Amino acid sequence: MVVTRARTRRLSLLETDSRPSTPQLDTVAELGTASPRATRRTRLNSSTLDVRTPTRTRRASLARGETPEPTTPSSVKRTARTPAKNTRSVRQQLTLTEEPEENEVKQEKPSPSPSPVPKEGKGKAQRKPSVSPSPGRTLTPNQQSDEKRVTRSMSQTPPMPTRSSSNTPRDLNDSPKVEQKAKPNIKTTPKVAVRLEKLSMDKFSGKKMEKAKPLIVPDELKDNGVVEEQNKSITEAHSQAPETHESAQPDKDAGKQSFLKSFTTLSKIQGSSKALHPDESADTITKITPTSTSKKIEENMDDVFETLRVESPKVERKIETLQKVHTVGTPEIKEKDEPVGVDNEIKTKTETPQKIEPPIIESKVETQQLIDHPQIEKKRDTPQNVSTVDLMDTSPEKDESMEDQEFLDAEDSIVQLEPQTDEPVEKPKELEFVDLDDDEPVFPSEAPKYVEDSKEVHPDDSMDDDKQNKIDVTEVIHLPSIRARAVRSPAVEQKKSVDFNNDTDDLEVEKKRFPKTPGREKVPVCRILTPKPETPLKLALQKGRNSSTPILKDQERGLSNSTEELHPAPPQIDAIKPFDELESKNAKDEMVEQSPMSKQKAENKILARLESFEEDVEDHGNEEENEEEHEEDKSISEFVDLEAEDAGKDYMSGDSMDSSLRREMEENEIPIDGESVGSKDTEESTPEESDGDDSFIVSDNEDEEDLGQLCYSSGEDEIEDAEESEQAERSSVKRRRIIIASPSDEEHDGKVQSNDDSSENKTEKPKNQSNCSSNASKLSEAAQLLNVSEEKSSISETELERSRQVALNELNKSERFNKTETQLDISVMEVDSSDHDEEEKTEKVGAKNNRSLYEIVDSDDGEEQDQDQSDADKPAESENHSEIKKSTSFMDQMSGAKGNKSVYEIMDSYETEDPKEAGKNEESDKDKPAENGKSDKDKQAETEMSDEDKPSEIKSPSTIKKSIISTADEEALLAELASSDLSHLEKMFNPLQKSRRQSLHVPSPELAAKNPKLRRRSERVEVGNDFCPSQSFVDMVAEKKRQKNKRKRLSKSLSGAPEDLEEMEIKHERKRLKSSHGASTDSMEEDNENETMTVAEEHHSDGEVSNGEVPIEEKPTTSSEKPSASELPEEEETVAVEELLMEKPKTCDSPRSEERPTEIVTSKPKGMAPVKVEKTAEYYLAYCHNLLEAANEAKLKEKKEHLASGAKQKKPKRIAAQAPSKLLGTIGSESETNTAKSSKQPPALKKDVKRLQAARQAVSHAVNLLAPPKATEAEPRTLSRKLSPQPPVVDKKSAKQKKGKKKQKPQEASPLKSSDEENHGHRIRTNAGYVTVVDEPPTKVPKIELIKTSSGMVRVEPCTPKQKYFRELPPTPKMHGFREEPGPSGMSRKRAKHAAPKVEHNSAKQAALRFKEQIFARRS
């Protein structure tokens, strides 16, 4: 049967039936045994309707041994109302538990009709087919005066007199109990009438329904013709049934007629109570079928009884018993049952019990239910369910004995009729033998089991017993009940129940077992929170750390170590036991304990050997803890003594880790200065793969030296050190990076000046080597170019220094704009590398290749990936070719001699924001031949410098060297970070965002490289001041933008409107031209245009978005600081910077900075002595402004980090917008005029606000195009992870900052005042007063880190685990044998962040479970 349909039928039939079954109370009242209102059923739900909820009265009566007559309807109801999962078992319970009581009550009067219906009732499977029997039940109330019983407090439908004739409703397949009652009343005389007593729904109905299901369907199939005949007979007997049932209770035929009449009434009532009964059709069918069955039974009682013997072996004994009793009533009921699927049994009973009267059956049901219920608990008193043939054979005997005990026979016959299963009826021996007389009061549900006893019991006696409600048990026949009936639950089972001996009964041999509804039965599940003694959590965390530390060899070691550690993870970290142990514990705690403990001990011994003695002690502690946990698993609240024993005096923070992990961490330990991607380490690993060294880690030795030099570039000393390190590196391995090229240059340079230059280059180059940064390569190569120019063009040292200064200035300019776009830096590097290439061609081809490789790295980093790849490929061939190709790609200038020019042009083409400088370079390059590339570049630089940088070029060589060294150190340090970051960032960005990766990839390395530049902001400011873009730069900007197909692609990919971006770039170029003139209004326009440009450039590249925004904004002074500040955050904050640009008007400042840097300060930073007083004043103002900006940018950087980490970005945007507006005003005024600063600041703020809004919109649009909704939050995280030299560290910092902020907010918001506004977030006003919401649990919980694992939430104890805590395992699931799922427990911990709420939630569950237990009379 489909549970839903069966339930609906039960609901419809059982409600009516339960009312018809209530009339049995009248019979019980006649018998005097029915407990008053014991049948009362609390109607919980339609689902519980089938399950006749044992009312406390019913339970009390059961405890008294009384079988409250309404119990049967209530049991039927319970089955109907039980939820779908429980319907099956509930149906079985219904049939046995309550109906036997009602059957007893009714068997006094209409026992013949109840017995057939109880048959169906017991076979709940029969309910499906016998939708018609439900009307039969409806008739029974009319038959019997039990209409009084109809009043049920629990009945969903109003109490119905038909319920008193629960015999007829028993016909209903929906209510097996009622059907059982009705069947014995109609078909069987008291002997044959099988009392449908509600055994505990769990025990009886579950098994009985299982058994009855096979009987029901086959019986329907077999007895469709019989059902038709029975329908006829029922229709005939339907009119007769009421009379017989009412007038002739002793007469079984009269009982049958009364049952039919009551059944007809019930059918009518059921038709009226369709709302209560989901299946009217089922009710109607049931009504029609039982009526016709009763009539036909009356007509063909004997014939059908014989037929039933033959057809259904289970029914045979019942049929004979019914014949003895009065087969007229019972056979009709059985025929009614035939439509239900008990058709064979119905036929048998229809033939046999012609005498059956509902009263007799009821008396039998009650008396025998008391007596037989133990038998039903024994699982089958009536062999009907087991083997109908045997029952048929014994039925005549039973009928004789049941003549003595008519009521017993009626009940037994009913029971026999109902079990329509093929199981042998004679499993009662397996069942515990229960004397009906002895157990009768205590176990009314077993009455059907005693139906086999009805063989010995005489039908006359059963008739008398029906009247008297007392059963004389001549023989106690133990028929196998459907389910093992546990006598132990008398409250439910005391009601006599008809057990259907079905195949399921054979399957379920345990008769005494208290049957739980299969849905209800819950296998005790092993503890799901099974902490593994050695949790891999720490190992996984350490693996993450190792992955964050990018040293390959160390990582490989770490991986091998981690794999080794996975098996024996240090148990000290977590004393949590593995699932295997815990699950095995639930099965057998102690046994499982010992085996895993032994395993743990073995592992702990190994670990102790590998690790320190403290770890071994901790392992023993863990074992003890595991034992404690095993012992405590039984208890609800488990004390998890995860506390590792005190590590001891010698315990170090890393001792708990495996020796391999500790070793790995020590080897990979990051120096305080930070790990550097040193040329030495990279050379050791792979000299030629220096380009491929994408690890964030900086080289250990030389990078540290380089960092020292960069930070403390004092000049020649550091240069000498750098030379030594470079020579060693050069000698050790040739690298693609410039470092090797610079040593080659140094080797080639035999001159002291060339050595000095090469020493400067070395100072720059080791940095470049370690960082592979375009800036470092630019500086070192620029110095090398100067040296080569000295060698080739025989220029004086001063000229070389001037050329170096020019190159450095250009590099600085390119860096300024490279902040926005790394292409400038790349071009600078390439320019230097091209010069170096010429030098290297003259000097060394291998050095050229190394340089070219390094330049390739920078070009890959600085340039967009398309050209970077081509450059990387071509420079590998030769720097000149790669640079020439670059120049052809960008500048369309192909000449090996013009390699310097082409490099500068490449720089210009790469310089999106430095296009002024690039333009100058290109123009100067075009104007001057590139035969002496370096000398030409020096001249070009001088031409550029001649505008503003000549004084700096005129600087003394020592001053030039110092400036070059300082800038070179600064830029080399930045270049190291940038270079190391660039290749790694390329790899990082490429998988996630190809378009972005290109754009972000170019700027982000420089940003990473520029992060350390903050140390030398002053020098950077000077470098920025040295850069003076000329108006030709604006032309070059236009050319660059036009020639920047890659950036256009980036803009297309990022902003999605490349053409618009190109137009915006053109506008930006125009505005930059205007800004180059230096008009304040132009600068303001340029700010707007620069914002658009920054947006466009940001679209070009995410890294460029951040860089472009700030670098464009950067003035000569601002450019030095902002590039440093912006470069530091840019890697992490590429998106954050975009947002900040949207927020800030710095973009407005950047055009001004660009315009005025060219105008104001270009040579000053390198020209130690300012050439112009105005420039010096502006320089100082710009320097102060840079300091202010540095502070602002530091704050902004923090905010950007928060943004990158995913912190709320709106707030940082607001802050950024406010701060930048101030910066914009200050910057604009400073760039325009020192005095005009303050005056221009407010208008700049207004314009900046508008610009900020426009920029924000553009940037937000671009960001949205780049990444849908998560662009602000998710992108910064990914970008920070990708761009940051050590993204995990940044993420950790950002996450910590977020956590700190969250913690601080509750602390700040802690309500000190009662006002709702101040404390509104944490203070809630209620009628009782103000409720303060305290975030204490989150503050406490973070101490113990919760990690979600397959076992659930695992608490990670601190490195020195000393905390003991109670892990409250919810007692409810374990106590009730429910599976404890980690999900709910983990969720509760997450929600409440402490285990207490789990118990609270479980308390509700416990209450519900207890309620269900009470309702279903069994433990859930």
UniProtKB/Swiss-Prot annotation:
Q: Which residues carry this modification: Phosphotyrosine?
A: 904
Locations of Basic residues compositional bias? 1-10, 1041-1051, 1295-1304
Q: What is this protein called?
A: Protein slender lobes
Q: Where is the composition biased (Basic and acidic residues)?
A: 171-182, 221-231, 243-255, 332-354, 449-468, 577-591, 600-612, 871-886, 913-953, 1141-1158
Gene symbol?
Answer: sle
Which residues carry the post-translational modification Phosphothreonine, per the record? 27, 33, 42, 53, 55, 67, 72, 140, 157, 307, 348, 352, 394, 530, 535, 563, 763, 820, 842, 1158
Which biological process terms from the Gene Ontology are attached to this UniProt entry?
nucleolus organization
Query: Which stretches does UniProt call biased (Polar residues)?
Result: 84-96, 129-144, 152-170, 232-242, 259-273, 768-778, 1228-1241
Query: Which phenotype arises from disrupting this gene?
Result: viable but sterile. The mushroom body (MB), a functional center for learning and memory, exhibits abnormally thin axonal lobes. In neuroblasts, the nucleolus is packed more tightly, forming a dense sphere, and the nucleolar proteins such as fibrillarin and Nop60B are abnormally distributed in the interphase nucleolus.
Summary of the tissues where the protein is detected: Present in all examined cell types, including neuroblasts, ganglion mother cells, neurons, imaginal disk, epithelial cells, germline cells and embryonic cells. Present at high level in cells with high proliferation rates, such as neuroblasts and nurse cells. In the brain, it is observed at higher level in neuroblasts, ganglion mother cells and young neurons. Detected at high level in all neurons of 3-day-old adult brains (at protein level).
Q: Which residues carry this modification: Phosphoserine?
A: 12, 18, 21, 35, 46, 61, 75, 111, 113, 115, 130, 132, 134, 145, 153, 155, 175, 233, 312, 395, 401, 413, 454, 462, 547-548, 560, 562, 595, 612, 635, 637, 653, 656, 659-660, 742, 744, 754, 758-759, 789, 794, 796, 827, 833-834, 852, 859, 870, 889, 902, 946, 952, 956, 999, 1004, 1032, 1051, 1053, 1055, 1150, 1153, 1229, 1310, 1314-1315
- Which organism was this protein described from? Drosophila melanogaster
